[in-house]
Amino acid sequence: MAAGMKGKRSRRRKERKNVEHGCAHIKSTFNNSIVTITDSVGNTLSWASAGGLGFRGSRKSTPFAAQMAAETAAKVAMEHGLKSIEVYVKGPGSGREAAIRSLQAAGLEVTLIKDVTPIPHNGCRPPKRRRV
């Protein structure tokens, strides 16, 4: 770095987008749930995850944690003027339905629910079975 320069980065203030319709992408795995709300183009408005909200360990994978993540993401997205969403659900986790219900309860109108879980046509070898 130059002699007079400090390690300071100028941070741009987030501009307030005004979006009526968007998409909610819910990724629910066996270990965590991530909710991302985007506009119709795909630019992220807000996101939240169960782990980011302070849930740790086995509590991260609960439906309640997914519900809280969806609620948090919905509140921030509604500040951008969001009113209706299409929901895309991915993964086998337990928080799928809870997250969708939470988005509806937050005051967003759900226009479409679609399962976009990737299904292999005999691709990679799955992990070995757990023996407990």
UniProtKB/Swiss-Prot annotation:
Residues 1-16 have a biased composition (Basic residues). The keyword Ribonucleoprotein applies. InterPro entries: Ribosomal_uS11 (IPR001971), Ribosomal_uS11_bac-type (IPR019981), Ribosomal_uS11_CS (IPR018102), Ribosomal_uS11_sf (IPR036967). Keywords: Ribonucleoprotein, Ribosomal protein, RNA-binding, rRNA-binding. GO terms for cellular component: ribonucleoprotein complex; ribosome. Located on the platform of the 30S subunit, it bridges several disparate RNA helices of the 16S rRNA. Forms part of the Shine-Dalgarno cleft in the 70S ribosome. Transmembrane segments: none annotated. One of its GO terms (biological process) is translation. GO terms for molecular function: rRNA binding; structural constituent of ribosome. It comes from the Bacteria. This is Small ribosomal subunit protein uS11. Residues 1-20 are annotated as: Disordered. Belongs to the universal ribosomal protein uS11 family. The keyword Repressor does not apply. Part of the 30S ribosomal subunit. Interacts with proteins S7 and S18. Binds to IF-3. Pfam families: Ribosomal_S11 (PF00411).
